[in-house]
Regions:
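Catalytic cores and adjacent flexible loops of soluble metabolic enzymes
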Residues: 1-193
Length: 193
């Protein structure tokens, strides 16, 4: 799950910086606020989704995008949290999640090593004892060549934690290569159509 509202993730503005410019996007020419308003998971759906997952023997957790989302998710007894790539430098959010004492997964898309050091340090200093990083190439779809799978062992060595892959490629080859290089978590992005 992803937990946010359009108002907590962007401004309801029509300026050039708030319009989607990617001509290949289904959302081309539309506002970011409109996209997030239409794409968000309604908060009242979270509990039924979590219950359904539990009944199927799966753990369900969420990516909060702001501190209020963490408060809401804590009311649902969220078992773990994922920090999305766009939020991996949002240190107050990382601090708030870490303070829950729950496991945290941080996606690393677009972050520099220095930014990741800050995020990992904040998580650990704020109480996170179970931390994992996901190697992530923030493009959809990502090409296997640009997925930089060989950095997985290096990340494990640098940060002393579990490392996995947030896989945006077509097919399963990148995930297999990631596991062969020591990945312990695979997050696979896919569509059913």
């Amino acid at each position: 799950l992803q937990t946010y509202t359009a108002d907590t993730i962007t401004l309801d503005a029509a300026g050039e910086d708030f319009i989607i410019k990617d001509e290949s996007s289904f959302w081309y020419g539309k506002s970011l606020h409109g996209l997030y308003r239409q794409a968000y998971t309604p908060w009242e759906w979270h509990q039924p989704i979590m219950d359904r997952a539990k009944n199927q023997g799966m753990a369900c957790f969420s990516s909060p995008f702001d501190e209020d989302s963490v408060d809401f998710l804590e009311e649902l007894n969220m078992p773990a949290y994922k920090i999305a790539s766009f939020e991996n430098n949002h240190l107050p959010l990382i601090k708030k999640v870490a303070a829950t004492g729950k496991p945290m997964i941080i996606s690393t898309g677009m972050a520099t090593i220095s930014e990741l050091y800050e995020a990992v340090s904040m998580a650990r200093e704020s109480g996170c004892e179970s931390l994992a990083l996901l190697k992530c190439t923030s493009s959809y779809p990502a090409s296997p060549e640009n997925s930089n799978i060989l950095t997985i062992p290096h990340m494990r060595e640098l940060f002393g934690c579990e490392v996995g892959l947030s896989d945006h490629t077509m097919g399963i080859g990148a995930a297999i290569a990631a596991v062969a290089n020591g990945a312990s978590i695979i997050e696979k992005h896919f569509t059913l159509s």
